[in-house]
Amino acid sequence: MKKAEPRVIRLLMELRRMGVVDTRVLSAIERIPRALFVAEPFLDQAYENTALPIGCAQTISQPLVVGLMSQALEVGERMKVLEIGTGSGYQAAVLAKLCRRLYSVERHKPLLAEAEARFKHLRLHNITCRAADGSRGWPEQAPFDRIMVTAAAPDIPPALVDQLKPDGIMVLPLGDVGGIDQELVRITKTDRGIDIQPFLPVRFVPLVEGIPEE
């Protein structure tokens, strides 16, 4: 592996200081070039710890949030993972370095086409995508060991809980879809129902039902 460039090293050091300590997650972030997922006008900010616009009124998440969500998900290398909200594909690419198989759902077809081209370029052959309503999950491929949702919902989508394996973990932002009062939560599916652990205030775009005409 070639040596990481200084701006990547600076970002990794910042993430570690801010709580991303899982070495597998840090390694995945190091190996995925965020610049490939950022729009050209923002390339100079590709390795800054900030969210950036990507089109279709969506964003590529702040690297700290990507790191903390990936860490909270506790992904094992033999696991099957569902991601809701492919977006630029950056979070999916990081997860793909951690799991055996990743399924990712995106409602915006133009974003999905761009993300799939990036996955092909990076030879991430363990990612399968489709354009669909993310709130419904991917029932044909269920159950999943882990589920990550990258858009905020006012309540936990029941379909996603149904598609989670027993003892499975889901990480998602919950709260006001206007982005004022949201919190990342980690949900564990137990034989008694679900255990909910909030762990970080955030601001995400809303989880929207249906597929837009584009």
Curated annotation (Swiss-Prot):
<dbReference type="GO" id="GO:0004719">
    <property type="term" value="F:protein-L-isoaspartate (D-aspartate) O-methyltransferase activity"/>
</dbReference>
<dbReference type="Pfam" id="PF01135">
    <property type="entry name" value="PCMT"/>
</dbReference>
<feature type="active site">
    <location>
        <position position="61"/>
    </location>
</feature>
<dbReference type="GO" id="GO:0030091">
    <property type="term" value="P:protein repair"/>
</dbReference>
<dbReference type="InterPro" id="IPR000682">
    <property type="entry name" value="PCMT"/>
</dbReference>
<dbReference type="GO" id="GO:0036211">
    <property type="term" value="P:protein modification process"/>
</dbReference>
<keyword id="KW-0489">Methyltransferase</keyword>
<keyword id="KW-0963">Cytoplasm</keyword>
<protein>
    <recommendedName>
        <fullName>Protein-L-isoaspartate O-methyltransferase</fullName>
        <ecNumber>2.1.1.77</ecNumber>
    </recommendedName>
</protein>
<keyword id="KW-0808">Transferase</keyword>
<comment type="function">
    <text>Catalyzes the methyl esterification of L-isoaspartyl residues in peptides and proteins that result from spontaneous decomposition of normal L-aspartyl and L-asparaginyl residues. It plays a role in the repair and/or degradation of damaged proteins.</text>
</comment>
<dbReference type="GO" id="GO:0005737">
    <property type="term" value="C:cytoplasm"/>
</dbReference>
<keyword id="KW-0949">S-adenosyl-L-methionine</keyword>
<comment type="similarity">
    <text>Belongs to the methyltransferase superfamily. L-isoaspartyl/D-aspartyl protein methyltransferase family.</text>
</comment>
<dbReference type="InterPro" id="IPR029063">
    <property type="entry name" value="SAM-dependent_MTases_sf"/>
</dbReference>
<dbReference type="GO" id="GO:0032259">
    <property type="term" value="P:methylation"/>
</dbReference>
